[in-house]
Regions:
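Membrane-anchoring hydrophobic helices of lipid-metabolizing enzymes
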Residues: 1-59, 70-71, 81-91, 110, ...
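Non-catalytic C-terminal accessory region of glycerolipid acyltransferases
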Residues: 2-5, 103-219
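Structural motif
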Residues: 44-46, 93, 120-124
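Short glycine-enriched loops at secondary-structure junctions
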Residues: 51, 75-80, 159-163
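Short helix-capping segments at alpha-helix termini
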Residues: 64-67
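Generic beta-sheet signal
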Residues: 74-76, 94-96, 157
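Surface-exposed cleft-lining segments at the edges of enzyme active sites
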Residues: 91-98, 129-134
Length: 219
């Protein structure tokens, strides 16, 4: 497993990438249902998957919750092969059809989290991109294995992208109440759906003013 979270590599990448992203993403609006959990255990951000941008959107969430901690993102091995440089930014490749691949990824993450228990792990249990209004979301059970084996605080995260009155979309991110690491995939899926529905309801109420009306911080 050649992945690692290299802070110099992340800083160099983001020096160029974040300005590029700002020209293509109008804003990332984040709201939290509760203050962040204590940093004595890892965080697992379990989110729906609506776009190529989602990992970078959740990087903004991680900056707010644990800005100085490493962040690891679980990605399909096939997708990671297209962007091998992501390995230096903590991206871990997994082939869901291969128990050995899953076991190696878990072993790598457990070792890294023992070194830095305040780390964050990003996981997209759908395994592929779907629109935010899809119901059910279709979470795979692998998220249960990662949450339990990593002994993590689990945060359900709903993501929705909306163009509003700008060319570039605004990402609305709703982070729910923390859950125990023994959570079932079905319950986690329901909680993420609840967060997405809250975003969609907010957009239905506020329309093009949603970006300005969004309750940044703890709601």
């Amino acid at each position: 497993m050649n992945s690692r979270f290299s802070r110099p590599a992340v800083a160099a990448f983001e020096l160029f990438f974040r300005p590029w992203m700002r020209r293509r993403v109008h804003a990332v609006r984040i709201a939290f249902a509760a203050p962040p959990p204590s940093a004595d255990r890892p965080l697992l951000l379990a989110a729906n998957h609506v776009s190529w941008w989602d990992g970078f959107v959740l990087r903004e969430v991680q900056r707010t919750l644990r800005p100085g901690a490493p962040m690891y993102t679980v990605m399909s091995s096939a997708e990671l092969a297209r962007f091998p440089c992501f390995r230096l930014m903590g991206v871990v490749g997994v082939d869901p059809a291969s128990p050995g691949s899953v076991s190696r990824a878990l072993g790598f993450l457990r070792a890294r989290l023992r070194e830095r228990p305040e780390s964050t792990v990003v996981f997209f249990p759908q395994g592929r991109i779907w629109p935010s209004h899809r119901r059910p979301l279709g979470f795979r059970r692998g998220v249960e294995v990662f949450a339990r084996r990593l002994s993590a605080h689990v945060l359900p995260v709903g993501i929705h992208a909306e163009p509003l009155n700008t060319v570039a979309p605004t990402f609305f991110v709703s982070v729910g109440q923390g859950m125990d690491g023994r959570v079932a995939a079905e319950e986690l899926e329901r909680r993420v759906e609840k967060e997405i529905d809250a975003v969609l309801g907010f957009l239905a109420e506020h329309g093009e003013d949603a970006g300005d009306a969004w309750p940044e911080g703890t709601r």
